[in-house]
Amino acid sequence: MTEQKALVKRITNETKIQIAISLKGGPLAIEHSIFPEKEAEAVAEQATQSQVINVHTGIGFLDHMIHALAKHSGWSLIVECIGDLHIDDHHTTEDCGIALGQAFKEALGAVRGVKRFGSGFAPLDEALSRAVVDLSNRPYAVVELGLQREKVGDLSCEMIPHFLESFAEASRITLHVDCLRGKNDHHRSESAFKALAVAIREATSPNGTNDVPSTKGVLM
């Protein structure tokens, strides 16, 4: 397996994003922050001996979801985003999903010697979600969370599945994420991101060979 790290920058007229990722966790840093004088403090920040997670998108609940995804995937992750939040949350959420997907794909490298498929369940109180992923190079997303509110915090509920769809498209994976039950939209969303993390962690884990896990012989 390779070092499995990546640094991705995405700059458009709508957002400026920088993401560093290590799929194996461990120390991680960005040499030059996009924030002037480090003026923005991460809403979702955690540092342990095994992981460094620092997320600042400008949308608190999105930070919380990305933090949960990184934590339970076993990643170290730094996300910096300056977006046009004076308009709404669409561009920031979508572009963060795209950039994170690109970073994940680059860090993963060739799909070789890994399980490829992964599945996971995660509860959060009354909510229960299921996720299934395939590192297939066939981007597709089916996301059914059954959210009822207009927003959770400052994040529009319609953008929560859209983030996952953008991540799947950019990372070129297939993912199915369903919330099976739950009454609270915060819980439904968080259990979904945690279930996805469990599935990704399994799919990217070594399978004991150096083979490409495909009858085609290639996943590219």
From Swiss-Prot:
Changing residue 30 to L: In strain: CLIB 219, CLIB 410, CLIB 413 and YIIc17 haplotype Ha2. InterPro entries: IGPD_sf, ImidazoleglycerolP_deHydtase, ImidazoleglycerP_deHydtase_CS, Ribosomal_Su5_D2-typ_SF. One of its GO terms (molecular function) is metal ion binding. One of its GO terms (biological process) is L-histidine biosynthetic process. Its cofactor is Mn(2+). Signal peptide: none annotated. Changing residue 216 to N: In strain: YIIc17 haplotype Ha2. Substrate binds at residues 14, 64-72, 90-94, 116, 138, 186-194, 214-216. It is an enzyme of class 4 (lyase). Keywords: Amino-acid biosynthesis, Histidine biosynthesis, Lyase, Manganese, Metal-binding. Pathway: Amino-acid biosynthesis; L-histidine biosynthesis; L-histidine from 5-phospho-alpha-D-ribose 1-diphosphate: step 6/9. Mn(2+) 1 binds at residues 64, 91, 186, 190. Induction: Induced by histidine starvation in a GCN4-dependent manner. Binds 2 manganese ions per subunit. It catalyses: D-erythro-1-(imidazol-4-yl)glycerol 3-phosphate = 3-(imidazol-4-yl)-2-oxopropyl phosphate + H2O. Mn(2+) 2 binds at residues 90, 94, 162, 187. SUPFAM superfamilies: Ribosomal protein S5 domain 2-like. Its EC number is 4.2.1.19. It comes from the Eukaryota. Belongs to the imidazoleglycerol-phosphate dehydratase family. Present with 2100 molecules/cell in log phase SD medium. This is Imidazoleglycerol-phosphate dehydratase. It comes from Saccharomyces cerevisiae (strain ATCC 204508 / S288c) (Baker's yeast). The gene is HIS3.
